[in-house]
Every structure is written in C-alpha cells, then in structure tokens.
C-alpha cells in the first residue's frame, strides 16, 4: 500500500487498452518506407492463400479462411463468412476487424459483397452481413 506522499510524487497509471485488430491501426508510407499510426475501419488487401482450418476443441468443422496481404504490407489471416465463396489467390478483398473465437490467429473478417468478393447466394434473412441483394418477388 503506497503512502499519500508516494502517490503525490507518482500517481497511479491507468491501464492502456490494447487494440483487438492491430493491423488496421497502421498505415505504410511507401515513399518514406515508414509506418504511421492511423486507425481505419476497413482495409483493402490481396489474397495470398485461400484454404480451410479446423477449429479448437470442442468444435469440429472446416472453416474457410484467407491469408491476406493488406495495403500496408501486413499479412493477416481473415475469416470468410457465409456458405460458399468465390475467392482465389489474387482476389482483392475488403477486411474488417472481428475475431473468430474458435480459430486461433484469426482476428479479421472479410466483407462479403465488396470488391472481388461476391455475396452469399440464396440468402434471405440477415442479408446485410453477407452482401446479398434483396430477392425479386
């Protein structure tokens, strides 16, 4: 327990909040070849590998993911939500934050219906998250 005098000399420091998606908080200046801190809600990237991953216990599935090189030259793993996708190796994708709890090392989601990523076909409910247009009557 510190004394009042110790607290006057050096007050308590508040805990600093660590970012859940650190790759979206850096910006690369290619002219100066330096990183700068600049928060962004999404970033554009190019797929370098598309594959499947098995989740942690007790779940069992083949979750689709893509390894993406972002526009700031950082490589990340991003989850591909929804049933079926059209992504290949050089597809350009939009990446947002948001982890997948049962996939270790996957802290980002790919935005469906943006850039080269198509929306989920035949989806009728919860279409907004999956980039699906309103079906014709």
From Swiss-Prot:
Region (Disordered): 1-55, 118-137
Highest taxon of the lineage: Bacteria
GO biological process: one example: translation
GO molecular function: rRNA binding; structural constituent of ribosome; tRNA binding
Pfam family, one: Ribosom_S12_S23
GO cellular component: small ribosomal subunit
Sequence intervals crossing the membrane: none
Keyword Disulfide bond listed: no
Keywords assigned: Methylation, Ribonucleoprotein, Ribosomal protein, RNA-binding, rRNA-binding, tRNA-binding
Positions carrying 3-methylthioaspartic acid: 102
InterPro entries in UniProt: NA-bd_OB-fold (IPR012340), Ribosomal_uS12 (IPR006032), Ribosomal_uS12_bac (IPR005679)
Keyword Protein biosynthesis: no
Role, per record: With S4 and S5 plays an important role in translational accuracy. Interacts with and stabilizes bases of the 16S rRNA that are involved in tRNA selection in the A site and with the mRNA backbone. Located at the interface of the 30S and 50S subunits, it traverses the body of the 30S subunit contacting proteins on the other side and probably holding the rRNA structure together. The combined cluster of proteins S8, S12 and S17 appears to hold together the shoulder and platform of the 30S subunit.
Family: Belongs to the universal ribosomal protein uS12 family.
Subunit structure: Part of the 30S ribosomal subunit. Contacts proteins S8 and S17. May interact with IF1 in the 30S initiation complex.
Alphabetized HAMAP family for the sequence: Ribosomal_uS12_B (MF_00403_B)
Name of the protein in question: Small ribosomal subunit protein uS12
Organism from which the protein derives: Staphylococcus saprophyticus subsp. saprophyticus (strain ATCC 15305 / DSM 20229 / NCIMB 8711 / NCTC 7292 / S-41)
Originating gene: rpsL
């Amino acid at each position: 327990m510190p004394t009042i005098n110790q607290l006057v000399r050096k007050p308590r420091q508040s805990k600093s909040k660590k970012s859940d998606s650190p790759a979206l908080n850096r910006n690369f200046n290619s002219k100066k070849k330096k990183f700068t801190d600049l928060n962004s809600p999404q970033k554009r990237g190019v797929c370098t590998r598309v594959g499947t991953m098995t989740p942690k216990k007790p779940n069992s599935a083949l979750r689709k993911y893509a390894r993406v090189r972002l526009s700031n030259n950082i490589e990340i793993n991003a989850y591909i939500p929804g049933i079926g996708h059209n992504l290949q190796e050089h597809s350009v994708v939009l990446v947002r934050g948001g982890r997948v709890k049962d996939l270790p090392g996957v802290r980002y989601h790919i935005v469906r219906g943006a850039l080269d990523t198509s929306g989920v076909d035949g989806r009728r409910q919860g279409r907004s998250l999956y980039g699906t247009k309103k079906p014709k009557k």
